Amino acid sequence: MKQVNMNRNERRQMRHKRVIKKIRRIDNDRPVMIVVKSNSHISAQVWDFNQNKIIASSSSVSLDLVNGNKENAAVVGTDIANKLLKMKIDEITFDHGGSKYHGRIAALADAARKAGLKF
């Protein structure tokens, strides 16, 4: 049910709960790529729940990119995909948190798919 009187933060939290519920229900054995965006940067890290550690990460800050726009999000996506493919990991689960799958998040995901990841 859509609630009209919710502010932006409450809607983001509801989206995040939905995404987490789907991840836990469907893909328990795959590593999870968690994407976080701020106003000026974007970052992605891959978490392996079986080993309980982060196995790869990439961000617009670590790559010395000026901002986190769509083009730079695509660069981050290809970078983390190449790191995972070197570790022979090609299937992951994508967690976009409470952010909409749109814009920078979608650009990062599409670039990771083009580089060879499956999710």
Curated annotation (Swiss-Prot):
GO BP annotation list: translation
Pfam families, per database record: Ribosomal_L18p
Keyword rRNA-binding applies: yes
Source organism superkingdom: Bacteria
Disulfide bond entries: none
GO cellular component, one term: cytosolic large ribosomal subunit
GO molecular function per UniProt: 5S rRNA binding; structural constituent of ribosome
Keyword field contains Coiled coil: no
NCBIfam families listed in its UniProt record: L18_bact
Subunit structure: Part of the 50S ribosomal subunit; part of the 5S rRNA/L5/L18/L25 subcomplex. Contacts the 5S and 23S rRNAs.
Family recorded in the similarity comment: Belongs to the universal ribosomal protein uL18 family.
Protein name (record): Large ribosomal subunit protein uL18
This protein's encoding gene: rplR
